[in-house]
UniProtKB/Swiss-Prot annotation:
<keyword id="KW-0687">Ribonucleoprotein</keyword>
<keyword id="KW-0689">Ribosomal protein</keyword>
<protein>
    <recommendedName>
        <fullName>Large ribosomal subunit protein uL30</fullName>
    </recommendedName>
</protein>
<dbReference type="Pfam" id="PF00327">
    <property type="entry name" value="Ribosomal_L30"/>
</dbReference>
<dbReference type="InterPro" id="IPR005996">
    <property type="entry name" value="Ribosomal_uL30_bac-type"/>
</dbReference>
<dbReference type="GO" id="GO:0003735">
    <property type="term" value="F:structural constituent of ribosome"/>
</dbReference>
<comment type="subunit">
    <text>Part of the 50S ribosomal subunit.</text>
</comment>
<dbReference type="InterPro" id="IPR016082">
    <property type="entry name" value="Ribosomal_uL30_ferredoxin-like"/>
</dbReference>
<dbReference type="GO" id="GO:0006412">
    <property type="term" value="P:translation"/>
</dbReference>
<dbReference type="GO" id="GO:0022625">
    <property type="term" value="C:cytosolic large ribosomal subunit"/>
</dbReference>
<dbReference type="InterPro" id="IPR036919">
    <property type="entry name" value="Ribo_uL30_ferredoxin-like_sf"/>
</dbReference>
<comment type="similarity">
    <text>Belongs to the universal ribosomal protein uL30 family.</text>
</comment>
Length: 59
């Protein structure tokens, strides 16, 4: 079983760059305080790095 990480959206996506909003959607985040559990892959890490200022990560 691969490693998973929990990602929580902490800030709103209103007024953000369209690419960053799409990254949040790609991660499965819809609203503030929404948490999803994702596999720890390079693709997921790349999306998290783009929106690091709007999310909180728990390993």
């Amino acid at each position: 079983m691969s490693k998973t990480i929990k990602v929580t959206q902490t800030k709103s996506s209103i007024g953000r760059l369209p690419k960053h909003v799409l990254c949040l959607k790609g991660l499965g985040l819809r609203r503030i305080n929404h948490t999803v559990e994702l596999e720890d892959t390079a693709c997921v890490r790349g999306m998290i790095n783009k929106v690091h200022y709007m999310v909180k990560i728990e390993e």
